[in-house]
């Protein structure tokens, strides 16, 4: 056992309690959190339930005692007789009242006090999402903080002999691990630890008064804003209908809400056995259901409408209702099937367990490389994410779920992980007897790792194991991997699952194919925490409950009778004659396989499954019982052919929860409902607005990012007294939409517009866009922010915010504005606007010499996606930067305004600073590059990156920095500590979204808040209702960002495929970003993509990694062209993908000749049809970056080869790969897949010159 494990084990024996200062987690975070220990995975949950049950019984007894005492006192007062013995007793014993959370009377006044927990919504309870605690719960309660060891039952659901940790002890262990790293000379992160002893004066001799679980609320604690008695009645969305309803906006039934199908007494629970449900009436309707009477159209608005608010993940129940989960049934459930997962803890108990520090709440993020593993982000409660090892510990949680996690000793989890990976290797070895073993510290799932033996104090890439199911293990037993015979002499047969040649790993073929999809289907590589034997996770845990799941989620994918892993061995895995299950493979790799009952599949699917192999379907998950390895779901609709461009776009929208049917007329689904029209403004409502319509006085120009709709306008005026006036005007959309109306509810449901190169999904109906868009000479109602600036310094002297009307003189698209600004001779008017924007930017990053370009476009995209989409995600024009900087200033001004007046109710936007461990890793990487700038503050970090002169290096470092940062989030001020309001990437202390109400619903909320401030009227919205809205807007905004990125990737793949249509691949220059022992990452600037070059895809003899100097040496087979090379294990047609057919037909020399010839003749590589398509979309065709050799006598291929660093030692042909080096690579697109992929290879520099 490792040193860490011994430390933790010794610590569990200590009699004294230990406390660690919390790092965040909400406005009511605890000062100290106790620790508990256990010996098996299920023991603590049993103890919890027993304690809660006993505590409630104790509270009932105390309440009865209190009533009896009160009756005795009343009787004594009436009779005038006092019993001296009773009097003395009464002076020393005052029974505790029942905790309001457990009152049987749901209408008790105590339910609205500090102890109340709203059950009408999700992700709005600070006890869940912000890990909120009562500061006084533990400070005077040492009995509850003591260590406990009980005789545990056998661990039937998980791993035996693992210790559980309270939040406090987990932080202590993490701090010790960090301290050891620092003492060893490694860059790390310090964790603040406070050793606090429990107050001895609070100790009691009686267990009844000493232990209170959960503790009673402190009568003297401060007012809690989240649960104030002043709050209005609970929020209901949509509101009750008043009068006639002119639309068919119908709430979705619970059978279509994933979060409503769990633990619901009216439907099969998530823990239920699906086989036992066959006798129940079928509640799941599907368009493919083979019962005509129940057929429904799942494309209708009524059916697919996700709920307007988040719904509670589990139905509220008394805590005793889940005791059956831990009954004496052993390994079997009530139906006799083996339980594969642990049942969830009852929802009613979890808030108090979180308050006690026994559980932590957070958002689960699936490890895309190994989908059974995951990480949980705790929103600041911990200084690092929690590692979840294996599907059992993940316990059926999905990407984006809000989960409750019990922390475990890291060493125990890590040892278990290593044992499982070794077991996996042995099982794979039964089918692969000629392979060389990996070192025990190697990562089975990642050939980009750096082991302790070769890393020389460098962090490795993530590793994780899959302790999954019998089915998954059987799949891995059947994996086979053969390698190039040219290097067989280098190794000897052993018992292992992955072959190694020096530092070069050989992945199984199925793993290669999986990596192609994981790495190839995104623009940038997705990285997780860097962990290995030397740098273990700081925290580990297992999921004990899913608190909330985003409702109404849909997934696109393909349908088959066999699992994808079985299809590779289809000869030996023929489907049964009458299969009961079809397998739905989601396009999103983070979503598990979904079992679809064949009766819900197309009618002829079983007989003609091959006919549907190229079809895309939409499915949803309905349940996931503890007895099943996979979730069960239903098919919602058939999208169409997998190669159809329209189907591809629809698939992206469905995967990201945009159905685009909110405004459609049910009578004519091809059109929007004609009754959706903006409310007209009366003359009286316009009178009190400030008037900016005089075109002689105000030269207002509107900005149209897309060229046809405008919501933002500017004017600049010289006041003549040494000041300038900058007016910023935003369309007053909410004046035209009644709050709570049908349009308002539908806009809230859509929440965000989606901007893709191929398609636009607006937030509002088209009639609103046409009517409300700013236009020259058209008077429009706006909300304005007017700054008075000093003419010389451009500092703000005063600010006016209010309602207004404007009449723009002109309208400019971003392209037109950029053209005027980039000509070098813009008008003085536009020059003034540009200089004001530069001044705002310089002050924002605290750099007086700052210029608008270059900009950190990736960091800025963490807050908001682009409206004018480019094919390269890194592209930013000067016009875009100028307008965006002014908008940021307006947004921050409005944020200050509403927060000053509304306080806790203000809807704001923040971005948390990166997790300390991720920032330490980033700092280590840039130090390896030779850069060492300050990373302690956002402004210094931004300035440090911007000062890098080399564009490729600067962008490369920005990519690495981008991966350390979370996306910005909406929040309600009263739910977050004020010191966490800041927006890190923008370096602003307070921020919100205000300037885009025609594409973001969050701006509608801010507009209404601002109007309440302007008119000095009470803002009556409930804080909990605002919390629901903010969380839903966060979810849909992230979906909109992902949809945009996937659509860009789709079009980029199409473009690259077209450019390389003649040769199958492109040859271009790339910059090396990171080097590992078996692979390296490259960045291709002209396409804005980052990809990984795998050593086992190249004709290499071996590879050697120098961890000290960060150099990877590739030992090439001379004369073998990597452009036409196919590894031996991929030559079997059944072992690889059809998408690479004809991709290796041209040699590297032919590719180089064609590219350089076309460049010399100024001929485009792209075809005319695609060139026209991109031109119509206002997109620029990428230009390949080709080498420029001074020696004109070199042929085309030699020009590329001359950029490499090579040497020949004896018979070894070696290429050196350094970080930040520019090397030639081969790029290809694979478009015959549900989502196309981009893959890269390195060019072999040791080929015959032709």
Swiss-Prot record:
Further details from the record: Several alleles of SSD1 exist in different yeast strains.
Residue stretches making up the DIS3L2 C-terminal domain: 1064-1148
Residues recorded as bearing Phosphothreonine in the entry: 227
Ranges annotated as biased composition (Basic residues): 497-510
Function, in words: Can suppress the lethality due to deletion of SIT4, and partially the defects due to BCY1 disruption. Is implicated in the control of the cell cycle G1 phase.
Pfam families: Dis3l2_C_term, OB_Dis3, RNB
The keyword Cell division appears for this protein: yes
The RNB domain, residue ranges: 694-1015
GO biological process annotation, one example: intracellular mRNA localization
Highest taxon in the source lineage: Eukaryota
Biased composition (Polar residues): 1-22, 84-94, 197-208, 264-276, 319-329, 481-495
Disordered: annotated span: 1-32, 79-163, 197-338, 418-443, 455-517
Domain CSD2: 582-657
Name assigned to this protein: Protein SSD1
Bias (Low complexity) ranges: 124-145, 277-287
Keyword annotations: Acetylation, Cell cycle, Cell division, Mitosis, Phosphoprotein
Residue numbers bearing the Phosphotyrosine modification: 688
Lineage, highest ranks first: Eukaryota, Fungi, Dikarya, Ascomycota, Saccharomycotina
Family the UniProt entry places it in: Belongs to the RNR ribonuclease family.
Residue numbers carrying Phosphoserine: 40, 164, 183, 286, 322, 491-492
Gene Ontology annotations for the cellular component aspect, listed alphabetically: cellular bud; cellular bud neck; cytoplasm; cytoplasmic stress granule; nucleus; P-body
Residue list for modification N-acetylserine: 2
Entry's Gene Ontology molecular function annotations: 3'-5'-RNA exonuclease activity; mRNA 3'-UTR binding; mRNA 5'-UTR binding; mRNA binding; mRNA regulatory element binding translation repressor activity
Cross-referenced PROSITE patterns: RIBONUCLEASE_II
């Amino acid at each position: 056992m490792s040193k860490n494990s011994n430390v933790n084990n010794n610590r569990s024996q200590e009699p004294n309690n230990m406390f660690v200062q919390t790092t965040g987690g909400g406005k009511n975070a605890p000062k100290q959190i106790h620790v508990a220990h256990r010996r098996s995975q299920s023991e603590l949950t049993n103890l919890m339930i027993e304690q809660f049950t006993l505590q409630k019984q104790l509270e009932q007894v105390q309440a009865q005692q209190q009533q009896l005492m009160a009756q005795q006192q009343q009787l004594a007062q009436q009779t005038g007789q006092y019993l001296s013995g009773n009097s003395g007793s009464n002076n020393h014993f005052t029974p505790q009242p029942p905790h309001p959370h457990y009152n049987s009377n749901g209408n008790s006044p105590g339910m609205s006090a500090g102890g109340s927990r709203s059950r009408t919504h999700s992700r709005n309870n600070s006890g869940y999402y912000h890990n909120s605690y009562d500061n006084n719960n533990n400070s005077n309660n040492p009995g509850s903080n003591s260590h406990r060891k009980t005789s545990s039952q056998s661990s039937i659901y998980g791993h035996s002999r693992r210790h559980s940790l309270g939040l406090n002890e987990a932080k202590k262990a993490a701090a010790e691990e960090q301290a050891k790293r620092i003492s060893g000379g490694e860059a790390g992160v310090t964790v603040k630890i406070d050793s606090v002893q429990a107050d001895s004066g609070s100790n009691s001799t009686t267990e009844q008064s000493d232990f209170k679980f959960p503790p009673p609320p402190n009568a003297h604690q401060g007012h809690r804003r989240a649960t104030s008695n002043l709050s209005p009645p609970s929020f209901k969305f949509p509101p009750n209908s008043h009068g006639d309803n002119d639309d068919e906006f119908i709430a979705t039934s619970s059978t279509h809400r994933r979060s409503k199908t769990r633990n619901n007494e009216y439907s099969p629970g998530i823990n239920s056995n699906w086989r036992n449900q066959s006798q129940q009436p079928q509640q799941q309707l599907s368009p493919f259901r083979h019962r005509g009477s129940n057929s429904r159209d799942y494309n209708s608005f009524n059916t697919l409408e996700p709920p307007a608010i988040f719904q509670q993940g589990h139905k509220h129940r008394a805590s005793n209702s889940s005791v059956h989960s831990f009954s004496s049934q052993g390994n079997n459930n009530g139906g006799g099937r083996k339980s594969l997962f642990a049942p969830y803890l009852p929802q009613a108990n979890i808030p108090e367990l979180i308050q006690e520090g026994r559980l932590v709440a957070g958002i689960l993020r699936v490890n895309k490389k190994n989908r059974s593993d995951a990480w949980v982000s705790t929103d600041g409660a911990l200084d690092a994410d929690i590692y979840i090892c294996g599907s059992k510990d993940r316990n059926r949680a999905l990407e984006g779920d809000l989960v409750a996690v019990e922390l475990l000793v890291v060493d125990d989890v890590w040892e278990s992980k290593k044992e499982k990976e070794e077991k996996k290797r042995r099982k794979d070895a039964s089918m692969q007897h000629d392979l060389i073993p990996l070192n025990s510290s190697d990562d089975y799932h990642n050939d980009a790792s750096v082991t302790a033996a070769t890393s020389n104090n460098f962090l490795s890439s993530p590793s994780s194991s899959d302790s999954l199911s019998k089915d998954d293990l059987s799949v891995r037993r059947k994996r086979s991997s053969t390698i190039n015979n040219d290097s067989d002499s280098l190794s000897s047969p052993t018992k292992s699952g992955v072959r190694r040649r020096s530092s070069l790993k050989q992945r199984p073929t199925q793993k290669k194919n999986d990596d192609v999809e994981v790495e190839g289907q995104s623009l940038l590589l997705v990285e997780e925490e860097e962990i290995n034997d030397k740098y273990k996770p700081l925290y580990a845990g297992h999921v004990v409950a899913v608190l909330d799941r985003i409702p109404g989620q849909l997934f696109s994918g393909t349908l088959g009778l066999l699992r994808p892993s079985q299809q590779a061995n289809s000869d030996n895995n023929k489907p049964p004659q009458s299969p009961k299950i079809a397998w739905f493979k989601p396009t999103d790799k983070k979503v598990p396989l979904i079992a679809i009952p064949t009766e819900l599949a197309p009618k002829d699917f079983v007989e003609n499954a091959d006919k549907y192999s190229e079809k895309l379907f939409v499915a949803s998950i309905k349940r996931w019982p503890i007895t099943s390895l996979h979730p069960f779901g239903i098919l919602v609709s058939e999208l169409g052919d997998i190669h159809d461009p329209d189907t591809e776009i629809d698939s992206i929208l469905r995967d990201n929860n945009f159905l685009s049917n909110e405004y459609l007329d049910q009578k004519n689904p091809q059109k929007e409902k004609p009754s959706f029209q903006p409310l007209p403004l009366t003359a009286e409502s316009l009178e009190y607005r400030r008037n900016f319509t005089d075109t002689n006085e105000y030269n207002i120009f509107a900005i149209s990012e897309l060229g046809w709709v405008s919501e933002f306008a500017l004017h600049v005026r010289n006041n003549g007294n040494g000041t300038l006036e900058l007016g910023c005007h935003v369309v007053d959309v909410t004046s035209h939409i009644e709050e709570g109306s049908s349009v308002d509810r539908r806009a809230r449901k859509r929440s965000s517009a989606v901007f893709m190169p191929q398609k636009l999904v607006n937030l509002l109906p088209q009639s609103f866009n046409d009517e409300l868009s700013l236009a020259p000479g058209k008077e429009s109602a706006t909300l304005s922010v007017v700054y008075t600036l000093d003419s010389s310094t451009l500092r703000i002297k005063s600010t006016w915010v209010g309602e207004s009307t404007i009449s723009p003189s002109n309208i400019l698209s971003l392209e037109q504005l950029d053209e005027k600004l980039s000509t070098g001779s813009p008008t003085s008017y536009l020059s003034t606007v540009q200089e004001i924007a530069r001044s705002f930017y310089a002050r924002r990053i605290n750099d007086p010499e700052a210029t608008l370009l270059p900009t950190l476009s990736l960091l800025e995209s963490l807050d908001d996606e682009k409206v004018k989409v480019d094919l390269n995600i890194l592209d930013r024009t000067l016009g875009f930067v100028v307008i965006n900087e002014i908008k940021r200033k307006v947004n921050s001004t409005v944020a200050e305004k509403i927060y000053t007046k509304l306080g806790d109710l203000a809807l704001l936007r923040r971005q948390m600073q990166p997790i300390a461990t991720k920032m330490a890793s980033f700092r280590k990487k840039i130090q390896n590059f030779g850069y060492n700038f300050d990373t302690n503050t956002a402004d210094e970090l931004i300035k440090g990156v911007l000062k890098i002169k080399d564009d490729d290096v600067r962008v490369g470092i920005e990519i690495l920095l981008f991966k350390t940062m979370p996306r910005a989030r909406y929040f309600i001020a009263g739910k977050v500590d004020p010191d966490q309001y800041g927006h890190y990437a923008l370096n602003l202390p307070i921020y919100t979204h205000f300037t885009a109400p025609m594409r973001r619903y969050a701006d509608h909320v801010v507009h209404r808040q601002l109007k309440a401030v302007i008119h000095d009227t009470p803002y009556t919205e409930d804080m909990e209702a605002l919390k629901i809205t903010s969380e839903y807007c966060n979810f849909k905004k992230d979906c909109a960002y992902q949809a945009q990125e996937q659509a860009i990737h789709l079009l980029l793949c199409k473009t690259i495929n077209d450019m390389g249509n003649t040769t199958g691949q492109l040859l271009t220059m790339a910059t090396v970003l990171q080097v590992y022992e078996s692979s390296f990452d490259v960045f291709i600037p002209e396409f804005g993509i980052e990809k990984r070059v795998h050593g086992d895809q190249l004709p290499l003899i071996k590879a050697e990694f120098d961890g000290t100097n960060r150099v990877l040496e590739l030992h090439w087979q001379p004369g073998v062209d990597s452009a036409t090379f196919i590894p031996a294990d991929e030559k079997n047609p059944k072992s690889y993908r059809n998408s690479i057919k004809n991709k290796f037909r041209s040699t590297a020399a032919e590719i180089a000749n064609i590219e350089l010839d076309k460049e010399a003749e100024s001929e485009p590589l792209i075809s005319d049809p695609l060139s026209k398509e991109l031109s119509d979309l206002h997109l620029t065709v990428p230009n390949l970056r080709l080498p420029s050799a001074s020696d004109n006598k070199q042929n085309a291929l030699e020009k590329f080869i001359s950029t490499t660093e090579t040497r020949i030692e004896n018979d070894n042909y070696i290429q050196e790969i350094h970080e930040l080096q520019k090397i030639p690579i081969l790029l290809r697109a694979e478009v015959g897949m549900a989502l196309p992929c981009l893959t890269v290879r390195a060019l072999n520099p040791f080929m015959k010159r032709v």
